[in-house]
Amino acid sequence: MEKKAKPGFWDKKILGTAVKGAFIKLNPVYMVKNPVMFVVEIGAIISLALCFFPNLFGGNNQDMILYNSLVFIILLLTLLFANFSESVAEGRGKAQAASLKQTQQDMQARLILNGKEKVVNANTLKKGDIVLVNMGEVIPSDGEIIEGVASVDESAITGESAPVLKESGGDFASVTGGTTVASDYLKIQITSNPGESFIDKMIQLVEGASRKKTPNEIALSTLLVSLTIIFLIVIVSLYPMAIYTGIKLPVSTLVALTVCLIPTTIGGLLSAIGIAGMDRVTRFNVIALSGKAVEACGDVDTMILDKTGTITYGNRMASEFIALDKGNKNYLIHYAILASIQDNTPEGKSIVTLGKDLLKEDLDTNDIRENQFIEFTAQTRMSGVDLADGTRIRKGAYDAIIKYIKNIGGEIPHDLEDKVNNISKLGGTPLVVCAEEKIYGVIYLKDTIKPGLVERFERLRSIGIKTIMCTGDNPLTAATIAHEAGVDSFIAECKPEDKIKVIKDAQSKSKVVAMTGDGTNDAPALAQADVGIAMNSGTTAAKEAANMVDLDSDPTKILDVVEIGKQLLITRGALTTFSIANDIAKYFAIIPAMFLAIIPQMQVLNIMHLSSSYSAILSALIFNAIIIPCLIPLAMKGVKYKLQRSEKMLAHNMLVYGVGGMIVPFIGIKLIDLVIAPLLTMMGLG
């Protein structure tokens, strides 16, 4: 599967906008939303005040102006780097939003009023309006096709150049504003008011206008705020103790100590990680309608998968007509064609095509308008036709036809079950055909399992994710395909309400459930699931019920989205571990330097042997600032995710980001000290 091309990290336009955004976000009204970085900003303001009023907190500190200035500059850079990381993440989304907005500019629509056309601005259309869109024209807003069949170019939204066939009725009647009618014409009923269309929602989300913190972000922010408060209490307590013991502790040093000990690294990158997670989902042409949905993907442990389209290609085609009595084969084909002549599904069309190829004589279908066609429903699980002469023809699932025949007083042929079972054992789908009380035979529908799924399901199983296949097929067919595909379990003869029951049962056991769907009958289950991915080719009801929409309408993407969600959680956890581990090294850099002159016993903790107290504090501050931009690519790209047991993954990340988070600052601070110590000596701060 190809990812959609997005603006690169080093795109000049994005970087320019990000630099500007970094300064704009210094506004305290914005900074207060990130308590950790807000504390840093307060520290920077205090340091700036001390540059002009060095004796603000008492004492004679005229010789500290240069030191205070250096602390202020480093703290300002820390804030700018943190804001820059968030602005870069937002910039990628805004670049995508700009391209989406181009599809809405100066768009006109042919509004049908009282049977007449009227050209109006697309942004004036409201729910319920009916518009006509001819070949080459852009569909003005989201809607449902009420008349016409046409190819629709969705490349402006999905990036896929191949047109998609759209027609009224069924699950492929939904169209998206901004796409283009490539052939024929469509009459569309608008389903959204101005500002509420799918493109409008996409623009709001990728620009970050409607992004809310996810539950895990809130929990992590609470932890970071708690750690910040604890360190603030420690620092505030340290000041009177220093005065009591006769130790001179400049306020700028206390500010520096505070900034170094609070988790500024993860505090500065937290928003960028969340925004980048949503961006990674959009790179797979999936629109997440909330950050919570992406995050929930990382916790998924149960996946409800439709057989058709997800596990198999979904193009079940008629392969053979199997008559119960060989002398009645032509009757079987004849009745199968009549029952399918108005069935616009691929299966129905394939039955008509194969049947006409096999029949030696032409079939008269001119009087079909006088017939009453019976549409397939998930409840009856059969379809058919009542002919003008009163003949009732039905085709459908084995058990549904059996029930139907018994209800009208017919008999069940003794060899029917064997023929149905033989097809099911081959992984095919049997459709039984009857006319009046007599069953004439079975249609063999074949489907193919998508390559690579067996290995993928095995990988999911290895990390504890259970896969459940839902299908309307009979148990034998379902069991054969489930075994071949390698899913953990299956639900045969599945109705829409069965999916909801499975989801609720799993959720009652504290499981996090994901599923895909495209039809109106999938909407309740999509709404119930923790992660519901609707196909863009599906109905409006399905897209409104889901919390994600797949623009490519590829149900197998649920597997990729789950992996992205897990990568998001792992990235956030890894960088949090790294940030907190950093504090240990910074502690050993600053604390001994502050008290060594007065408390010689601190020499035991002075394992870094930094040049001076000023050099130690400034080196730690500089490292604290530059580590943020160094980690921006990792926050944006995400920690490399491997499908493995959580215990093994935790051990690996603790080693890399925990132990590594302690070692890197020791090396970094020492190297910075070696560079700046001579400069500080020249400035009189040696």
UniProtKB/Swiss-Prot annotation:
Its main location: membrane. The chain crosses the membrane at residues 37-57, 64-84, 223-243, 255-275, 588-608, 616-636, 656-676. Pfam families: E1-E2_ATPase, Hydrolase. GO terms for molecular function: ATP binding; ATP hydrolysis activity; magnesium ion binding; P-type potassium transmembrane transporter activity. One of its GO terms (cellular component) is plasma membrane. Keywords: ATP-binding, Cell membrane, Ion transport, Magnesium, Membrane, Metal-binding, Nucleotide-binding, Phosphoprotein, Plasmid, Potassium, Potassium transport, Translocase, Transmembrane, Transmembrane helix, Transport. It comes from the Bacteria. It is a multi-pass membrane protein. ATP binds at D343, E347, F376, T377, A378, Q379, T380, R381, M382, S383, K395. Gene3D superfamilies: Calcium-transporting ATPase, cytoplasmic domain N, Calcium-transporting ATPase, cytoplasmic transduction domain A, HAD superfamily/HAD-like. It catalyses: K(+)(out) + ATP + H2O = K(+)(in) + ADP + phosphate + H(+). InterPro entries: ATPase_P-typ_cyto_dom_N (IPR023299), ATPase_P-typ_P_site (IPR018303), ATPase_P-typ_TM_dom_sf (IPR023298), ATPase_P-typ_transduc_dom_A_sf (IPR008250), HAD-like_sf (IPR036412), HAD_sf (IPR023214), P-type_ATPase_bsu_IA (IPR006391), P_typ_ATPase (IPR001757). Mg(2+) binds at D518, D522. The active site is at D306. Its EC number is 7.2.2.6. HAMAP family: KdpB. Part of the high-affinity ATP-driven potassium transport (or Kdp) system, which catalyzes the hydrolysis of ATP coupled with the electrogenic transport of potassium into the cytoplasm. This subunit is responsible for energy coupling to the transport system and for the release of the potassium ions to the cytoplasm. NCBIfam families: ATPase_P-type (TIGR01494), kdpB (TIGR01497). The system is composed of three essential subunits: KdpA, KdpB and KdpC. This is Potassium-transporting ATPase ATP-binding subunit 2. The gene is kdpB2.
